[in-house]
Amino acid sequence: MTKKLHIKTWGCQMNEYDSSKMADLLDATHGYQLTDVAEEADVLLLNTCSIREKAQEKVFHQLGRWKLLKEKNPDLIIGVGGCVASQEGEHIRQRAHYVDIIFGPQTLHRLPEMINSVRGDRSPVVDISFPEIEKFDRLPEPRAEGPTAFVSIMEGCNKYCTYCVVPYTRGEEVSRPSDDILFEIAQLAAQGVREVNLLGQNVNAWRGENYDGTTGSFADLLRLVAAIDGIDRIRFTTSHPIEFTDDIIEVYRDTPELVSFLHLPVQSGSDRILNLMGRTHTALEYKAIIRKLRAARPDIQISSDFIVGFPGETTEDFEKTMKLIADVNFDMSYSFIFSARPGTPAADMVDDVPEEEKKQRLYILQERINQQAMAWSRRMLGTTQRILVEGTSRKSIMELSGRTENNRVVNFEGTPDMIGKFVDVEITDVYPNSLRGKVVRTEDEMGLRMAETPESVIARTRKENDLGVGYYQP
């Protein structure tokens, strides 16, 4: 009988990527097939996030539901991974003794051995260590699911912003070697992937080893990825202003595969609050980056993260944030009310902004961003946008749907053979959450740039011969 695996994922795109790798790994080693129904599963995995408020209680609430399933099926294996597991592993074991496996973001590759151990002697396993980049060496080959894919290029963060748990839960920055990244992307391209989103907690801090032992920059990596035939669109997230160097901006000037959209978190427009946050940059330095970017790529649109109600934030500080939002003209944002994360320096600060004031500031900020986003959408009316067709529209099975470079969903009439390809669409209608258009050009008429085939990249970067024997590539 087929063994089944259920994974519940909370949090960032890195967690989504990790969960997909867990599924691929346990399919390869144990034959587990994914199911959306927890009651059907032989193994339940919870991939957690500790960024938001009450993250721990959310975990225990979910585990309480799964405990009932285990009471009915004692052979059921329950595992908790992700950032809450990394931060609170022993506490989870003490409070939820029925949990069999606790693993961190850097030890998910050891899940097969952990499951075997639990199956063997029923002893619980806790492994929340930080074995650097080892996990990527033990994951199965990537499997494409549609024309877009996420690829993790680094882990961790060295910035230690005062509100953030990432350095404590995912460790400090560790970069994957460039050949490993290119090999994975080339494999995805060979399976029909057209757009890759490079992931990292501080993605533009990537400094990976090249085949000759030298260290490559993030700008170098972007150009190498863009050279792979079939990869015609590149995104990356999440970046940090302090690492946004001029060589990255030059890639925007000369590499059309890099989209005209950037998510660059700023958090606040007040230098005083930025200093309390440990951000190590000013609002003016942030605006200077945007100015250079728009000189290199005039049509680029910017999104950001904001925290409102940080300890000590005054009305004047908030007004400076609103001024920054207007000056940059952000297209969208992920914005949240400050909530202290245990173990961070900000948790020891006096949270002196009233809750109602925080909510009011968040409402004002989000309303302004929404207005700016709609204005950006209206400017697209009558323009021709290049769309990567992802599949049928959720609005109508008779229509197709895809995304623009600036991440707008566009619905339009088309044929099934367009799925997985690019089309140029004239925007005819603008709605709050989507656009509508009509196809004016198909991919065959575009003459997309070709540089190096995926097969060539695979042959150049693979670490073993046809017999599976590893070899040294000078």
Swiss-Prot record:
Transmembrane segments: none annotated. Residues 3-120 form the MTTase N-terminal domain. Binds 2 [4Fe-4S] clusters. One cluster is coordinated with 3 cysteines and an exchangeable S-adenosyl-L-methionine. Signal peptide: none annotated. Residues 378-441 form the TRAM domain. InterPro entries: Elp3/MiaA/NifB-like_rSAM (IPR006638), Methylthiotransferase (IPR005839), Methylthiotransferase_CS (IPR020612), Methylthiotransferase_N (IPR013848), Methylthiotransferase_N_sf (IPR038135), MiaB_methiolase (IPR006463), rSAM (IPR007197), rSAM_horseshoe (IPR023404). It is found in: Cytoplasm. CDD domains: Radical_SAM. [4Fe-4S] cluster 1 binds at residues 12, 49, 83. [4Fe-4S] cluster 2 binds at residues 157, 161, 164. It catalyses: N(6)-dimethylallyladenosine(37) in tRNA + (sulfur carrier)-SH + AH2 + 2 S-adenosyl-L-methionine = 2-methylsulfanyl-N(6)-dimethylallyladenosine(37) in tRNA + (sulfur carrier)-H + 5'-deoxyadenosine + L-methionine + A + S-adenosyl-L-homocysteine + 2 H(+). Keywords: 4Fe-4S, Cytoplasm, Iron, Iron-sulfur, Metal-binding, S-adenosyl-L-methionine, Transferase, tRNA processing. Its cofactor is [4Fe-4S] cluster. Residues 143-375 form the Radical SAM core domain. It is an enzyme of class 2 (transferase). GO terms for molecular function: 4 iron, 4 sulfur cluster binding; metal ion binding; N6-isopentenyladenosine methylthiotransferase activity. Its EC number is 2.8.4.3. Its main location: cytoplasm. PANTHER family: CDK5 REGULATORY SUBUNIT-ASSOCIATED PROTEIN 1 (PTHR43020), MITOCHONDRIAL TRNA METHYLTHIOTRANSFERASE CDK5RAP1 (PTHR43020:SF2). Monomer. Belongs to the methylthiotransferase family. MiaB subfamily. This is tRNA-2-methylthio-N(6)-dimethylallyladenosine synthase. It comes from Shigella flexneri. The lineage of its organism: Bacteria, Pseudomonadati, Pseudomonadota, Gammaproteobacteria, Enterobacterales.
